[in-house]
């Protein structure tokens, strides 16, 4: 029998030993398939080829072995495990490789038992097919075992790794499952009978017979993705899923599905916040920012999955599929590496760089030249469309698809689709080099390149009505020269006259943001600094400076209860983070500054913590202004500014009611 539709998820059911027929270590896969004719989901089995004992051992590496005291051993163990899982998913028989392509319209051939896939047919001009199904949303709360903060004090790895070394666990919990408005509550104290009865609201549970064995198939009803909030503890998520697994398979005379987990908490220095369950449950899990206020549509959900280009990011570069090119791509002798896609490039002839111990490097520039910020809106998208088949790419009309996300997608091509990766990087590099050279002829020097598509230029004061058209013309001519393309890139240019600055550390402040309408403390601070610099070019106008800081503090005060105004993203293990419950620091996280230059986790959906140190943010702006002052004035003005900074803080300290 044939069935038309698309694969929504492909996973492993188990690695089976058929003792009777002497077939050992045979992986049996489970495919969640959407029938386009009946608009329904089905689970089918696929029998793979025998795998080696060595591969199975690596796939089966336990958490206990991963969380070793030696960090190098931990990295080696999780690397071996993830690489082996990827080999299992992409390196087995051809039918498995075909089924690993999600959301592609295809035809599956079933055998006579109607639940085993024996062949797959994909059209040569494969097209995307996104089934219109709503996601499941999971929300959890729970309590954790106690752990001494003294055990979490050193900075060699994330708090998550330190906690798991000491058997940190969830003691009790409650959670809810919600699909399209149907919400059911669960508790860790409930009986298996109650749990199973509730799960039947969301899943179809059937028993299949294959190779003289019984297999329990758990198929979601009209959803293939589980969404959880970006601030949910990953240990809590793992505990809840394991709880459901135990209740589903307890006392069942069936071959148990494997059940394992890969996520950022397994890596000692953290990783991307992407989780993958090996075996049960056979669905996607996606972490969503501010899920309480905005549930993504099906197009956005499918786009996020397509951007994995295979398995979630936490499985590393081996989790990316091999992508064919739409054009003939040459072999490269001089191979660019991942460093070529660095998200921040700076011109050392213009920008000063300071190395800061146990923190991110600081880059800064102060000058009296005009500032031009050229945003090359769609060059990365255009290159992907040029070299990558459309069926591997997301829908670019989705506002979620930003250039920095596409850069991550390109970086994932590095290992298995290296020729495409090299071609794209080579073209971006050649285009930027051509464009920067053209701008140099206009007396414009580049300072920063952010995310390979935003370029900051400085130059002598000229008529912007002359410079702006020349910049656009330069982009178009360089693009045509390098790509030989008639397509005109979309370009946005921001012009800031006068006295400009840029300061990049853990926060990014720049005069380029003075026209921004976004509500964030860095925008307010940038506007204050721009006004202070402009008012102090001949002599330091301390009265004017005080007034500008006073206005900044007034805006700070008006936003003092808005957590989105204060929170920033921080990379795992880069800063000292106060002790917190759960595993919340193993991936990029939101936080605010507290006293003694420490961070405290701040969830988007929770009220702003009363431990925030508002004065820290004022001091950051004062320190940047003092740094500028040293480049232009004497120690006398600097000393006066130090006194002024102290006065600004003392005059406004009580207004924030700092504890």
Swiss-Prot record:
Task: Give yes or no: UniProt keyword Transcription.
Answer: no
Write down the Pfam families for this protein, in alphabetical order: Herpes_HEPA
Residues folding into a coiled coil are none
Chief localization: host cell
Q: Which GO terms describe its cellular component?
A: host cell nucleus
Biological processes per GO annotation? DNA replication; viral genome replication
List keywords of the entry alphabetically: DNA replication, Host nucleus
The membrane-spanning stretches of this chain are: none
Q: Where in the cell is it found?
A: Host nucleus
InterPro entries with a match to the protein in the record: HSV_HEPA
Domain of life where this protein originates: Viruses
- Which HAMAP family does the entry link to? HSV_HEPA
**Protein family (similarity comment):** Belongs to the herpesviridae HEPA family.
What is its biological role?
Component of the helicase/primase complex. Unwinds the DNA at the replication forks and generates single-stranded DNA for both leading and lagging strand synthesis. The primase synthesizes short RNA primers on the lagging strand that the polymerase presumably elongates using dNTPs. The primase-associated factor has no known catalytic activity in the complex and may serve to facilitate the formation of the replisome by directly interacting with the origin-binding protein and the polymerase.
What is said about its interaction partners and assembly?
Associates with the primase and the helicase to form the helicase-primase complex. Interacts with the origin-binding protein. Interacts with the polymerase catalytic subunit.
The name this protein goes by in its record: DNA helicase/primase complex-associated protein
> Which species is listed as the source?
Human herpesvirus 7 (strain JI)
**Encoding gene (name):** U74
